């Protein structure tokens, strides 16, 4: 459900129906991908590397508790990490990120019925907050083995890009809320699309192209 929800969150009602993009939701335990081509969902893929895999890598390599490893991982982005631990944490995260980028490459290679893959990539989810993920996607040449027509551009999805949902609390501030907002949007949409003979896929495609 999550990749479809993220797709719905990005496209909205008034978005260009010819939208093509790769959407990635990096959660705690998995990474979910959805490929949108000309406004339709071409499929979704999932593999088991999320934010906790990076924490476990730090835990294992540095010989610390899971809680301490999580603090080190988060501290790397906020510059609140002991200087003596920085290199070890960076090395642990880098090794896991290299495996993760291999998972992205493998997942996208399975969309072999498309002539080419969309060059726009949008990330969301708490796991995507790690700077090293963006660095791997933007700095490596992993995409050259796949049918991209140009180097992909990578961005986080912003809450203000979610059509039809307005945050009046001021608390929804970044990409970590996008999946929940997308699920809310799909829940609202399903009340409007109630064709008894339609499959879930048909309903989702109708929502995406509305």
Where are these regions (language model features)?
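Short, glycine/acidic-enriched loop or turn micro-motifs at the edges of active sites
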Residues: 5, 28-29
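Short beta-strand scaffold segments in enzyme catalytic cores
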Residues: 31-35
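Helical "lid/coupling" subdomains associated with nucleotide-phosphate turnover
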Residues: 5-12, 16, 20, 46-62, ...
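Short, flexible segments with low predicted structural confidence
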Residues: 29-30, 109
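Short glycine-aspartate micro-motif
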Residues: 21-25
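Short hydrophobic beta-strand segments in globular cytosolic domains
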Residues: 41-42
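A short glycine-rich beta-strand->turn/loop micro-motif centered on a GG-aromatic cluster
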Residues: 1-3
């Amino acid at each position: 459900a999550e990749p479809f929800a993220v797709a719905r969150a990005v496209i909205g009602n008034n978005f260009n129906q010819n939208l093509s993009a790769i959407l990635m939701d990096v959660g705690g335990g998995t990474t979910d991908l959805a490929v949108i081509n000309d406004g339709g969902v071409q499929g979704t893929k999932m593999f088991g590397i999320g934010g906790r895999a990076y924490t476990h890598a730090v835990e294992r390599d540095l010989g610390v508790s899971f809680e301490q490893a999580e603090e080190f991982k988060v501290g790397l982005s906020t510059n609140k990490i002991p200087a003596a631990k920085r290199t070890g944490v960076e090395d642990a995260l880098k090794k896991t990120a290299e495996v993760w980028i291999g998972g992205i490459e493998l997942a996208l290679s399975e969309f072999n019925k498309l002539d080419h893959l969309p060059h726009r990539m949008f990330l969301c989810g708490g796991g995507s907050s790690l700077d090293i993920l963006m660095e791997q996607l933007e700095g490596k040449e992993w995409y050259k083995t796949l049918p991209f027509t140009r180097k992909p551009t990578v961005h986080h999805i912003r809450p203000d890009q979610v059509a039809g949902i307005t945050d009046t609390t001021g608390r929804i501030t970044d990409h970590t809320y996008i999946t929940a907002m997308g699920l809310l949007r799909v829940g609202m949409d399903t009340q409007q699309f109630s064709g008894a003979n339609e499959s879930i896929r048909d309903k989702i495609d109708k929502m995406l192209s509305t």
